[in-house]
Amino acid sequence: MESTSNPTVSFLGIDFDLTILAMSLLTITIIFILVFWASRKMTIKPKGKQNVLEYVYELVNNTISQNLGHYTKNYSLLMFILFSFVFVANNLGLMTSLKTHEHNFWTSPTANFGVDITLSLLVAFICHIEGIRKKGIGGYLKGFLSPTPAMLPMNLLEEVTNVASLALRLFGNIFSGEVVTGLLLQLAVLSPFTGPLAFALNIVWTAFSMFIGFIQAYVFIILSSSYIGHKVHGDEEE
């Protein structure tokens, strides 16, 4: 397989991945357009595109309510945005392939570990901020000594593993999916005999990858809401 890389630009000594930046911006644009279009001329009795939008929002709302309880309404919009971004980003790489011998110009943003770890760190940041807001700094820090001060190292390790597992799970599934898609595309142009087989396999794999993309977005908000719920409910559980 030919090795290609994403084009980059350096600014203030930092390298920025232009492909990832462009695809992330495209993801946000697609979500904005779809939500804006689906929310126009809304009626009391939903139908058509409004019905789809409300169904997705309710799906997210019902999913996170298991972890957030009466705090659900405070985080519904955040989780809807996270779910939408991860789902669309997961599937962008399945739409087409755009590359030269040197550079790749089209990929799923979530096939890049930098994007995934950034999303995980964002969730972790929100968890800590919400924990401090609910309990105060003293009460929040005291939670790391629960149930006994001896658990401090394990509690700190748990914070790190939560971030790492959230990012690695998403990255591993989406990146591997793009690798298989790339192999099938290469198989398609290998010879006239392998082309039809690769085309058929790619259709099946694309459908399966879209399902995996949905599952990963779904799991992402389940875990994110679980982490936030643990922080905001901690004082109630004690």
From Swiss-Prot:
Belongs to the ATPase A chain family. Coiled coil: none annotated. It comes from Streptococcus agalactiae serotype III (strain NEM316). Key component of the proton channel; it plays a direct role in the translocation of protons across the membrane. It holds the Pfam family ATP-synt_A. It is found in: Cell membrane. Disulfide bonds: none annotated. GO terms for biological process: proton motive force-driven plasma membrane ATP synthesis. This is ATP synthase subunit a. It is a multi-pass membrane protein. One of its GO terms (molecular function) is proton-transporting ATP synthase activity, rotational mechanism. F-type ATPases have 2 components, CF(1) - the catalytic core - and CF(0) - the membrane proton channel. CF(1) has five subunits: alpha(3), beta(3), gamma(1), delta(1), epsilon(1). CF(0) has three main subunits: a(1), b(2) and c(9-12). The alpha and beta chains form an alternating ring which encloses part of the gamma chain. CF(1) is attached to CF(0) by a central stalk formed by the gamma and epsilon chains, while a peripheral stalk is formed by the delta and b chains. The chain crosses the membrane at residues 18-38, 75-95, 112-132, 179-199, 203-223. Keywords: ATP synthesis, Cell membrane, CF(0), Hydrogen ion transport, Ion transport, Membrane, Transmembrane, Transmembrane helix, Transport. GO terms for cellular component: plasma membrane; proton-transporting ATP synthase complex. InterPro entries: ATP_syn_F0_a_bact/chloroplast (IPR045082), ATP_synth_F0_asu (IPR000568), ATP_synth_F0_asu_AS (IPR023011), F0_ATP_A_sf (IPR035908). Its main location: membrane.
